[in-house]
Amino acid sequence: MKRLEIFGATPSPYTQKMLSLLRYKRIPYNLHWGDTRGRLESLNLELPKPVLLPVILFENEDKKLAATTDSTPMIRRLENEHPDRKVIPDDPALAFINYLLEDFGDEWITKYMFHYRWHCNDDADKAGTILPLVEFPRALNDEEHQQMKTWITERQTERLWVVGSSNETAELIDQSFKNFLQSFNELLKQQRFLLGDKPSSADFAFYGQISQLVRFDPTPREICHQMAPRVVAWVEIMDDLSGLDAETLMWTDLENCSGSLKAILAEFGKMYAPLLLENAKAVEEGLQEWSVDIDGSSWKQKTFSYQAKCLNWIKDEFNGLSDADQLKVRSFLADSGCEQIL
């Protein structure tokens, strides 16, 4: 089997998402840490726009290697090319819930991660210190390191608007994270993964973000260890599932899914769904920023066109279901708040 070439960074949640998935599916790969742009340019490859991590080289229609980003479609391609040890459920209704959860992991749990990493002073200091040392392909002297620390920290803190992080929303994000942790910890008392006894792509999306919250960033790490020991242990297990005997394990039927899973979805429905809808409305109306009331508090952020695409992709997935499967999904999501984005 030909080895994939993957380019990423250790503190990148999406890099960790894909590495864990590749190990689970037993797909061989060569991993290149740091300086992704420079490495791709040295290979005379056209840079993806934008250069998001990780980058994986896939053959294009001309049978030439192309630098590819965006973990969700990459997983679907890998699922088609490597059908063993599936991460997408066969049941269409359950597969949609999995897709929804994967999007929530990639687009909402990442708000927790980015907020803590760059809003909190101790966390930003650690990230600013470590990121230059894992990103650059050569050793940095102290002066170079300090310059890069300052540059990276300023660049990232200036991008807090992307996730809606601010002094005004900090308490809302912190409480939502704790609500999510509590529900996820409860779920792990009953089963090993989100949808049953083996992982789906949603687990890998959750893992990518939570790996940083549990391991790298000081503030959420302390919260996780105090509140959710099962989540901490789950992260350690998710790191490498290559030995899991997946063929003997099952996903849960949709009607038998855990009540804790519904609690997780309800947190997303309360917090993330209104943001998706208001952001999409702002994109359509050409607004530069928008605000919405969430759980009694005001959330204000700049318009983010990519998340409008995420909402459309969710709707496309739902509209691709049969009438019977749509009914199953609507019944499962009833009163969660998630039904409003269908």
Task: For each feature predicted by the language model, list its residue ranges.
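GST-like domain detector, emphasizing the conserved glutathione-binding G-site
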Residues: 1-143, 194, 214-215, 267-342
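Alpha-helical packing segments of well-folded alpha/beta enzyme cores
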Residues: 14, 18, 173-180, 184-187, ...
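Soluble or luminal CAZymes and related metallo-dependent hydrolases
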Residues: 70, 172, 176, 230
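Structural signal for well-ordered, non-membrane alpha-helices
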Residues: 106, 181-185, 239
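Divalent-metal (Mg2+/Mn2+/Ca2+)-assisted nucleotide/phosphate chemistry catalytic cores
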Residues: 123-174
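Short N-terminal edge-element motif at the start of the domain
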Residues: 160-196
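GST superfamily/GST-like fold recognition
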Residues: 194-214
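Active-site/pore-lining binding-face segments in mid-to-C-terminal subdomains
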Residues: 207-298
